[in-house]
Swiss-Prot record:
Family: Belongs to the NmrA-type oxidoreductase family. Isoflavone reductase subfamily.
Principal localisation: cytoplasm
Originating species: Pseudotsuga menziesii
GO cellular component annotations of the record: cytoplasm
GO molecular function (one): oxidoreductase activity
Name of the protein this chain belongs to: Isoflavone reductase homolog 2
Enzyme Commission number, as recorded: 1.3.1.-
């Protein structure tokens, strides 16, 4: 499982999660099945763990 880690709240709105996924390298994009700790101001600053 690839997890996008940020510093916000679990369960943010789906549109924010989708926006965050767009910033992933394309080779990971289709393999993401969990996004946690998403905060709008953190979009684009995520790391793969």
């Amino acid at each position: 499982i690839l997890i996008i880690g940020g510093t916000g709240y679990i369960g943010r709105k789906v549109d924010v999660v989708i926006s965050a996924v767009k910033f992933l390298p394309s080779e990971f994009g289709n393999d993401v099945d969990r996004v946690v700790f998403v905060k709008e101001e953190d979009i684009g600053t995520f790391t793969i763990k």
